[in-house]
Amino acid sequence: MSARVRLCTSLALACAFTLALSSCGFHLKGALALPSGIQSVYVQAGDPLSPLKQDIEQNLRANAIEVVTEASPSSASIVIVGDSVQREILSVNERARVSEYLLRYQATVQINAGSADAQRELMPQSQFELSREYSFDERQALGAAQEEEIITGELRADMAQLILRKLAVQAKR
């Protein structure tokens, strides 16, 4: 087969693949896009040093969205009602010792637009849950504790991104 035929075939396959992906709604994750009416975001949590609050604010700043210290008429508000991590035993080995755990990260969030005196609810209080499994080796207990901390941090970062995607979708309605 000549180089020209291979090139044409490759281009045709690439075009067909691109068309198939775009027709199913797939697109690369890009920057967070908020409607023009929302110029800033206020993040409220019971604990001002909440790691989830900090992750959300960091993601907002990374997307060039202003984070404000109080709600205003042109801002959206993310209210973190609560978040928690739970560890569950997923499986045990033949000696009845834990071999796998499941970590569940849950967050309860509400999204509003506008200032406190003229607020409209974009998303009612909703609970989101993410989970991840990991293997546990009792001979490496110290490493397992570090692994659990890393996985918890990854789940929290994923939760922050999920909440911001919800904000973007709800704000466009």
Could you describe each region identified by the protein language model?
Residues M1-L13:
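Bacterial N-terminal signal peptides that target proteins for export
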Residues G25-L28:
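Bacterial signal peptide processing site
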Residues L142-R173:
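C-terminal/domain-edge helix-coil "capping" segments
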